[in-house]
């Protein structure tokens, strides 16, 4: 009996004009997620997804490449305007933001939503090199 050919499911094209870009930049990686106003994910990318391994993931260039990839996927869904929420202490924050602006998005607002403790958990010990 012949095996039935599996059908390739094509992702349906949503028509969303505005959304929110969540840029999470850690010391080791940069993750960018573009959502609609309700928080449903439209596209996402990270420096690790772009093929960067190890310490190269934490570079501004890797964050720029991830932002360009994420922006390209969001433009396919018809997105034009973005609010940007930046989180974390990493080095890829500004370069990811610049890459989103260069991709043709109109950035309406930039918010820093990095969580700041009011003397919460004890921080990790200082690194001595």
Swiss-Prot record:
Disulfide bonds: none annotated. GO terms for molecular function: rRNA binding; structural constituent of ribosome. One of its GO terms (cellular component) is ribonucleoprotein complex. InterPro entries: Ribosomal_uS11, Ribosomal_uS11_bac-type, Ribosomal_uS11_CS, Ribosomal_uS11_sf. The keyword RNA-binding applies. PROSITE patterns: RIBOSOMAL_S11 (PS00054). Coiled coil: none annotated. GO terms for biological process: translation. Keywords: Ribonucleoprotein, Ribosomal protein, RNA-binding, rRNA-binding. NCBIfam families: PRK05309.1, uS11_bact. Part of the 30S ribosomal subunit. Interacts with proteins S7 and S18. Binds to IF-3. Located on the platform of the 30S subunit, it bridges several disparate RNA helices of the 16S rRNA. Forms part of the Shine-Dalgarno cleft in the 70S ribosome. PANTHER family: 40S RIBOSOMAL PROTEIN S14/30S RIBOSOMAL PROTEIN S11. Belongs to the universal ribosomal protein uS11 family. This is Small ribosomal subunit protein uS11. It comes from Beijerinckia indica subsp. indica (strain ATCC 9039 / DSM 1715 / NCIMB 8712).
């Amino acid at each position: 009996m012949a095996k039935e050919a599996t059908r390739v499911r094509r992702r349906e094209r949503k028509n969303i004009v505005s959304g929110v870009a969540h840029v999470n930049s850690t010391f080791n990686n940069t993750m960018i997620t573009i959502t609609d106003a309700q928080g449903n994910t439209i596209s996402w990318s990270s420096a690790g997804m772009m093929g960067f391994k190890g310490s190269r993931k934490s570079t501004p260039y890797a964050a720029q490449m991830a932002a360009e990839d994420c922006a390209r996927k969001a433009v396919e869904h018809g997105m034009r305007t973005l609010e940007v929420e930046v989180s974390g202490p990493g080095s890829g924050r500004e370069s990811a933001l610049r890459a989103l602006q260069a991709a043709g998005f109109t950035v309406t607002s930039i918010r820093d939503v990095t969580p700041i403790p009011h003397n919460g958990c004890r921080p990790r010990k200082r690194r001595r090199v």
